[in-house]
Each structure stands twice: as structure tokens, then as C-alpha cells.
Amino acid sequence: MKIYGCISGLLLFVGLPCCWCTFYPCHAAEARNFTYISHGLGHVHGHEGCRNFINVTHSAFLYLNPTTPTAPAITHCLLLVLAAKMEHPNATIWLQLQPFGYHVAGDVIVNLEEDKRHPYFKLLRAPALPLGFVAIVYVLLRLVRWAQRCYL
């Protein structure tokens, strides 16, 4: 029973990151590429570079699309959400990933081109780690842990 638990654990912790990176390609963002166009309230569209507009409300949904080769890394998007939360502490931001689509609904616009000198946005200067690198490190750590439990 212990062996079956080890095998299923290995399959789980190796398979999930591989499937995740298959459907969501792991690419780092160009964090200094700030160009974006907003088309009205509730709809934000731009080129396939770094998204530098975030629209949030007190109960907003943020849809990210990390499927394109030049799309921002998920870690970078989380930094954007964190910066928006620090800028607007009363807003509740719901983050959701979907395979094909990038849509932000809201009435509070965070323009990084104008506000990137704000101290909260200095977080964005940090390099965005690709999801694949994080997944590989996580899988290696879990493999070591499972090996210790199974064979030591």
C-alpha cells in the first residue's frame, strides 16, 4: 500500500505541472514593455506584450491569457494584482485563468506607464519567473520528499 501511495504521488506531482505547462506555455514577460490600449469601461485590449492596464472594481474578475508566446508570466500578473491591491486596498480582486481570453472588468484603471514610479509598483521591476522553472523546482523538491518517505 505504501508503494502504491508513492507511485500515485509521483504521478500526481510530476503529471500536473507537465500538463499545466502544456496547456499554459511558460514564457517570461518583458516587464519593461509598457504599451497598452483601453477601449471603454470594462473591456481592455492590447497587443501581445506586457499588459500594463488593470481594471478592478470592489468585486472584479481578472482573466489572464498566458497562452501566447509573448504573454506575461503568471508570476508577473500576480505582481500586477498585488500592486493594484496595495494601491486600492478596498478592492476585492478575483484572479482567474482561462485558456483563450484576456478580459478585465472594472472602473479603477491602473496605468503603469503613468504610475510606475509609485513605490508600490517597484515590485514590478523584479524579474518574472517562468512557471516552468517554478514547476520544475517544485517537482524536484517533492521527488526528494517522496524518496525520503518511501525508501528511508
Curated annotation (Swiss-Prot):
Gene Ontology cellular component list: extracellular region; host cell endoplasmic reticulum membrane; host cell Golgi membrane; membrane; viral envelope; virion membrane
Signal peptide (UniProt feature, chain positions): 1-21
Membrane topology of the entry: Single-pass type I membrane protein
InterPro entries, A to Z: Equine_arteritis_virus_Gp4 (IPR004257)
Location within or outside the cell: Virion membrane; Host endoplasmic reticulum membrane; Host Golgi apparatus membrane; Secreted
GO BP field: clathrin-dependent endocytosis of virus by host cell; virion attachment to host cell
Function of the molecule: Minor envelope protein. Part of the glycoproteins heterotrimer GP2b-GP3-GP4 which is probably responsible for the attachment to target host cell. This attachment induces virion internalization predominantly through clathrin-dependent endocytosis.
The protein's name: Glycoprotein 4
Organism: Equine arteritis virus (strain Bucyrus) (EAV)
